[in-house]
A protein has these predicted regions:
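Alpha-helical segment of the N-proximal tetratricopeptide repeat
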Residues: 28-53
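Short coil turns that delineate tetratricopeptide repeat
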Residues: 63, 97-99, 133
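Start-of-helix register in tetratricopeptide repeats
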Residues: 33, 67, 101-103, 137
Length: 159
């Protein structure tokens, strides 16, 4: 990690940061990669609240950065904030366009499924499988989604 960035992260982690504005002010000179690495480091240091604040600061400064959209989407998923994860991963798909990766589609489908919108999850995976028909990860995700959909349909207590 960039030494100056690491020092800033350590200072932020040691201090009681009062809000997003304080974080943005402290890190406004850093790159999207610095933000991604910083969020990873803060999560590894068991500081999820500051990691979230840093991700939000990164998004406010670089809203179209793949690095920040990826880490922010993953962070939202770990927090089980499915609507935010969906929004961030959809933004990532829009930014990547034809460069979108199978894992991005897998994570987006999973976020939709966890948000209990199985139709959207199937739509994402079906679209991805048209691009990568032999991708084992996507095939496995689709099979898991089919089983989950069947289990949900069979259970009267869902929804």
């Amino acid at each position: 990690m960039h030494i100056e960035f690491q020092k800033t992260m350590q200072q932020l982690a040691a201090a009681q940061v009062s809000g997003l504005g304080d974080v943005v002010k402290e890190v406004s000179d850093f790159t999207p990669i610095d933000f991604r690495v910083g969020v990873q480091w803060l999560v590894a240091q068991n500081n999820p609240h500051l990691a979230q604040a840093l991700a939000e600061a990164g998004l406010s400064l670089y809203p179209d950065s793949e690095d920040i959209l990826v880490i922010s989407g993953l962070l939202a998923m770990t927090r089980e904030d499915w609507p935010l994860a969906i929004e961030l991963l959809q933004d990532l798909v829009k930014v990547q366009k034809e460069r979108v990766q199978p894992m991005t589609c897998q994570m987006l489908a999973r976020a939709w499924a966890c948000n209990l919108d199985m139709d959207q999850a199937h739509t994402v995976l079906d679209s991805a499988l048209k691009i990568w028909p032999d991708n084992e990860t996507l095939i496995q995700e689709k099979n898991t989604l089919i089983l989950s959909s069947l289990a949900m349909a069979a259970s009267p207590e869902t929804h």
